Design a protein with these regions (language model features):
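Alpha-helical transmembrane segments and their immediate juxtamembrane cytosolic regions
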Residues: 1-287
């Protein structure tokens, strides 16, 4: 084990660690209602998304077929978002207490792939294409606001408003409306890619930005609440724990690793719905 750490961790090893932490996090997420799952599962799980993000940054940078890479991420993200949309609007397949999964990290990664390609085009001095790619992601929510303002009658037509809602939550999501991740996750992803090649600078800047967004800003809002005590930043508002993923990122040795290529794509949706289904059965059994 010490020898492996000395030699660093390859991409497969980092993903495996992230996968294990993600499972702990989602066990807490889906079975928290039992009161039997320790919060530490969720705390450890805060490191999972940043690690997967880092691995996706490296994967996108090194893949030989970016279009296929993007389509795979887009396809999985769109399918999961479509099912989530169905649960929200049709109120189908919900757990007895009304709970349904809001796991949409692939949509964040899909949007980031577009931004990363834009960053590369800017590096290649293809300024028009680069700016257009990044602007498409950033401006899409505002385009939709302008569109709905120009045609307010759409919101009065149930079928039309449903179609629009589906489009902007599933195949063409707004970065402001994704139910998993946050704007700090997207900003962090853009920074990780833009600063690739300078590992210490990359991770220092990323960690500072995440700490500012998820600790400092959160603390500023939380401290206005009556009864808030600073220790709640370690027991309730612990999203910022993800910053410690930088320590594992530092161990990355630049190697892709062997095996499990497809596992990391399909394990995410598979384990989400298996755990969700199990939680539904367990909830019904406890009633």
């Amino acid at each position: 084990m010490l020898t492996k750490l000395k030699n660093g961790l390859d991409g497969t090893q980092l993903k495996t660690i992230a996968l294990a932490l993600m499972v702990l996090d989602h066990i807490h997420y889906f079975f928290e209602f039992t009161g039997c799952i320790p919060t530490v599962f969720s705390m450890l799980g805060r490191l999972s998304a940043p690690l997967f993000l880092f691995c996706t940054v490296e994967g996108f940078a090194h893949t030989h077929d970016r279009r296929r890479y993007f389509i795979r991420i887009w396809g999985i993200g769109t399918a999961m978002a479509a099912l989530e949309f169905f649960m929200i609007y049709a109120k189908a397949f919900r757990r007895g207490d009304g709970f349904y999964p809001l796991n949409a990290i692939f949509q964040d990664l899909m949007l980031l792939c577009i931004v990363w390609q834009g960053i590369d085009w800017l590096r290649e001095k293809k300024f028009a294409k680069g700016i257009a790619a990044i602007a498409a992601v950033l401006c899409w929510p505002f385009v939709m606001v302008a569109f709905l303002s120009a045609f307010p009658q759409i919101q009065q037509m149930p079928w039309a408003s449903t179609v629009v809602a589906f489009v902007i939550t599933s195949p063409l999501p707004l970065w402001t409306g994704i139910t998993d991740g946050s704007w700090s996750f997207l900003l962090g992803g853009a920074l990780l890619y833009a600063l690739r090649g300078r590992r210490k600078v990359q991770l220092t800047v990323w960690a500072l930005v995440i700490f500012l967004c998820d600790f400092v800003l959160t603390f500023g809002m939380a401290c206005r609440q009556e009864g808030f005590v600073w220790t709640q930043m370690f027991t309730t508002y612990y999203e910022w724990f993800g910053v410690f993923a930088a320590l594992l990122m530092l161990l990355y040795n630049g190697q892709r690793g062997k095996g499990h290529k497809q596992l990391f794509y399909w394990f995410y949706p598979a384990h989400v719905y298996l755990l969700y289904g199990a939680s539904c059965l367990f909830y019904n059994a406890l009633r």
